[in-house]
């Protein structure tokens, strides 16, 4: 029985997938804390789909897919900020416009050059078959993002919480927003290998949303989100070995189950908890 439980650890590709997924899940969860604070979960969705044309172009020209995805994500983020700054459109309308435009462009490129683009890898990810070069790319992305987040997390928190106060202490909201979107785009690129473009949104939203239901303190929220993101990613890869199913699907399913548990039973914000308190107060 023990040999069966330890079997996944005997394969190098499984060990690589577990370690990489854990790191990606943790860093994406860290960013998801800020998305919850600002109410920007839709931006995470937009960026996760906006990288598709960059990936498609990179595949078509035999370039590193991470390069194309990163620049597409940055372009999408800057487009959102720019259009919002020069128009009266609401943020959700701008995000929806950019998201649909970039995703449609990606599908168009794929349809025009289908043999050059591995659509399945873009949509579903391929963490179990990831090449060593891609592992190094993802490791560098995660390392740089982690260092920058640890250096600037307090500044980002102030920018997201109160831009007016941030300006009074000499911080530039525009600079830190660009920095955040750059980090988010980079992490989306890393997560593409794990769960694919369609499910990336779950990794940059669900851990933060779950933690948001459990605490009102940002530092605690971030810690809970990171733990949830890392653990579900590790366990998801492990379970997928026995299920012989899509790794990304298993990871996101686990994260969704934990969210539902928090949604129902959170001590302060859980649906059943609030209903119980309402009945007791009658």
What spans do the regions from the language model cover?
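Transmembrane helix-bundle core of multi-pass membrane transporters
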Residues: 2-16, 87, 91-154, 282
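Structural signature of hydrophobic alpha-helical transmembrane segments
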Residues: 13-25, 63-75, 139-143, 189-203
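Loop-to-transmembrane alpha-helix initiation sites
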Residues: 17-20, 66-72, 92, 96, ...
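Short loop segments and helix-boundary regions at transmembrane helix junctions
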Residues: 33-115, 212-223, 242-243
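Small-residue-rich segments of transmembrane alpha-helices in multi-pass membrane proteins
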Residues: 50-60, 97-109, 129-130, 173-178, ...
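Membrane-helix/interface signature in polytopic inner-membrane proteins
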Residues: 147-180
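Transmembrane alpha-helical segments in multi-pass inner-membrane proteins
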Residues: 198-249
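Cytosolic-side transmembrane-helix boundaries in multi-pass membrane proteins
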Residues: 245-282
């Amino acid at each position: 029985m023990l040999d069966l439980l330890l079997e996944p650890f005997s394969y190098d590709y499984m060990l690589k997938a577990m370690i990489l997924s854990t790191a990606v899940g943790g860093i994406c969860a860290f960013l998801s804390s800020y998305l919850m604070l600002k109410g920007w979960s839709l931006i995470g969705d937009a960026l996760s789909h906006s990288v598709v044309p960059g990936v498609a172009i990179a595949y078509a020209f035999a370039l590193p897919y991470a390069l194309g995805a990163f620049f597409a994500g940055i372009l999408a983020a800057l487009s959102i900020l720019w259009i919002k700054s020069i128009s009266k459109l609401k943020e959700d309308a701008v995000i929806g416009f950019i998201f649909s435009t970039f995703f449609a462009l990606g599908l168009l490129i794929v349809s025009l050059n289908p043999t050059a683009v591995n659509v399945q890898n873009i949509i579903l990810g391929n963490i179990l078959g990831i090449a060593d070069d891609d592992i190094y790319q993802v490791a560098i992305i995660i390392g740089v993002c982690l260092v920058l987040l640890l250096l600037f997390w307090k500044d980002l928190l102030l920018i997201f919480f109160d831009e007016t106060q941030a300006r009074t202490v000499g911080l530039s909201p525009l600079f830190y927003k660009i920095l955040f979107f750059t980090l988010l785009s980079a992490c989306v690129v890393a997560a593409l290998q794990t769960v694919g473009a369609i499910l990336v949104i779950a990794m940059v939203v669900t851990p933060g949303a779950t933690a948001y239901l459990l605490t009102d303190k940002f530092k605690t929220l971030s810690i809970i989100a990171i733990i949830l993101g890392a653990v579900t990613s590790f366990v998801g890869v492990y379970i997928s070995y026995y299920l012989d199913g899509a790794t990304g699907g298993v990871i996101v399913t686990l994260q969704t189950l934990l969210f539902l548990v928090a949604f129902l039973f959170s001590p302060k914000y859980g649906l059943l908890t609030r209903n119980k308190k309402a009945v007791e107060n009658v």
